[in-house]
Curated annotation (Swiss-Prot):
GO cellular component entries: aminoacyl-tRNA synthetase multienzyme complex; cytoplasm
Xref: HAMAP family: Pro_tRNA_synth_type3
Similarity-based family: Belongs to the class-II aminoacyl-tRNA synthetase family. ProS type 3 subfamily.
Subunit and interaction comment: Homodimer.
Protein name per the record: Proline--tRNA ligase 2
Amino acid sequence: MAKAPVLTPRADDFPRWYQDLINKAELADNGPVRGTMVIRPYGYGLWERMQQEMDARIKETGTQNAYFPLLIPQSYLTKEADHVEGFAPELAVVTHGGGKELEEPAVVRPTSEMIINDYFSKWVQSYRDLPLLINQWANVVRWELRPRLFLRTTEFLWQEGHTAHATYEEARDFAAHIHRHVYADFMENVLAMDVVLGRKTAKERFAGAVNTLTLEGMMGDGKALQMGTSHELGQNFARAFHTQYLSKEGKQELVWQTSWGSTTRMIGALVMMHGDDNGLRVPPRLAQTQVVVLAIKGDEAVLAKVRETGDRLKAAGLRVQVDDRTDVPFGRRAVDWELKGVPVRVEVGPRDLENGTAMVARRIPGGKEPVALDALAALLPTALEEDQALLLRQARERRASRTSDVSTIEEAVEAAAGGGWARIPWATLGERGEAELAEHAASVRCLVAEDGSVPGADDAPGNVAVVARAY
């Protein structure tokens, strides 16, 4: 009798496969309150690596980290009408504290534009105080009616950047820099994710923004996932909070602002873009464990060689874990590491010891081959870089093969329903066509210029709408 698969095959039931993988790879579990989640150590380790890589890129822009309160006075949300209207259905409101009803209810932050702008208005007085560049790593709460681990949860972790500038051009350019040189660079070069950079339509724009730049990725089932956004806020929040500065000419001027964010949703994207029927495939540059060295048997000589090999690979600059457990069968351990997507397994048994070799299993391309133990430290860094490039290439090939250029709304709907993306001239689709797409569970993920670059305006000549079903 054939052995039952560990995971539901993706082709049979993609949502079930996703939930199976989250569970079996020990990434997360459901929390006790609907829509919340417990991020398990392996899943949180991925988030920590994302934080490390992102934080370094954010700080290169001159942005500094800070932290603002979780609770926001409800009155703050009335100061920017579009913003509060956009978030009203998702708000969690605290009405009691210390056993008493609060004089003013407090909102659990859905995002921090309001409270951060209150402090910006105090901190910015002169042109010398600009630009003001702040980021925070935090949790936010947006009440979710249809939760799915990592993709849509009531509470999630993220980073949110907030900046104030003296001119429109400076703010616009900073938002674009975050979009391309922080987010896209991280997603392509660390996560090995193929992303489309574009601008949101007015319908999809962030509440209170004048322009939203987005990064959209195609998942394994052809649906789109928004991976991160960078917003030009214009002077909307500055006007609401009277955030002004004294210019060099001695005039009081309103600041120009941006905000931008990315979340633990990227872990869900990692699963759906790179995972296969055997589990996760973690990009080597991201992986908290790039190489796991396993003992096939609990022989003392084998265990000693496994530990020695682990030390040599660590000395070569690799992130290594030694699995020398003797109370768990080797086959079970190998399957567990495959599920977790560790890029390379180095397996050592008594026969390997005699031959001076190890069996090397590469998770991303698949397959095993014997490699001399003495050659591992020299060969594995190159193999890991090859596998990093392979993941990105596979993601790009998937999108290219499942994206079609169309000329009618009907063709766009058909492409999205079939698990693909469609590119249609925005002049053909327009806002009326965008509304029609919604009736078929599809949406405009972003607008791109004819050459694939980010357009400077929604109605720029030649703009193309990227249409898909989305998470």
